[in-house]
């Protein structure tokens, strides 16, 4: 949500107030308690687009996360039943992320590990790019169908190129100019970060093109190697 709030183009408030009907969101909705649960039940009774962020803890019969007396998994399954499109937003919702790392005591899972009877659009990233989230929603609303996805379930219109292909440091890679340590001359001169762990050559994402915070920055632009979060 923070990523969307700080995205460019159409503002988050314009999307929420003028373009879509956001019927249930724990962070933005005004109702609480029984009123919020009624809003969720009302939404589940009609066709809707479901956007999920965060992994789903399934261990101990769902005891690690309950909402209105229901496990997070049960809430997800009920919300997905009449959903015309399902978006898993962020690395946690897509793959379970850090919470799903061994030994994974909470049994955290990504959305498509639980929803098996419908396609799930994976908008990956930590955080995901706000413009990609709104672009995916706009595609579904405009065309009445889900966008074409890659082998990982990500929209091809956003995840069809490697970070390496559009990286402003690519010329240094081609010239064999690599940062060896974060305080060396290469680091100060903006050389390629591949030899200090950059995953840009194998990571598909529009990060170098869209960036974050009104296009004011992104990890490699700040001197940190890509960690491959998408």
Regions found by a protein language model. Give the residues of each.
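Short Cys/His-rich Zn2+-coordinating modules
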Residues: 206-212
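Extended hydrophobic packing segments that form well-structured cores
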Residues: 212-230
């Amino acid at each position: 949500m923070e990523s969307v709030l700080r995205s460019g183009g159409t503002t988050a408030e314009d999307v929420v107030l003028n373009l879509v009907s956001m019927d249930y969101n724990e962070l933005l909705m005004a109702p609480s308690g029984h009123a919020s649960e009624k809003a969720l039940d009302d939404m589940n009774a009609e066709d809707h687009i479901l956007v999920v962020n965060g992994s789903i803890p399934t261990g101990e019969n769902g005891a690690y996360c309950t909402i209105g007396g229901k496990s997070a998994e049960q809430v997800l399954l009920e919300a997905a039943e009449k959903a015309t499109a399902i978006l898993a937003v962020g690395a946690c919702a897509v793959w379970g992320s850090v919470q799903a790392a061994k030994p994974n005591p909470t049994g955290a899972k990504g959305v498509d590990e639980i929803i098996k009877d419908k396609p799930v659009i994976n908008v990956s990233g930590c955080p995901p790019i706000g413009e990609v989230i709104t672009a995916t929603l706009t595609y579904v609303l405009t065309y009445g169908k889900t966008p074409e996805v890659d082998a990982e379930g990500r929209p091809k219109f956003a995840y069809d190129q490697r970070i390496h292909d559009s990286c402003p440091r690519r010329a240094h890679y081609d010239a064999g100019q690599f940062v060896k340590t974060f305080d060396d001359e290469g680091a100060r001169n903006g050389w390629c970060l591949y030899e200090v762990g950059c995953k840009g050559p194998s990571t598909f994402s529009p990060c170098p093109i869209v960036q974050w915070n009104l296009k004011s920055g992104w990890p490699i632009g700040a001197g940190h190697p890509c960690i491959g979060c998408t």
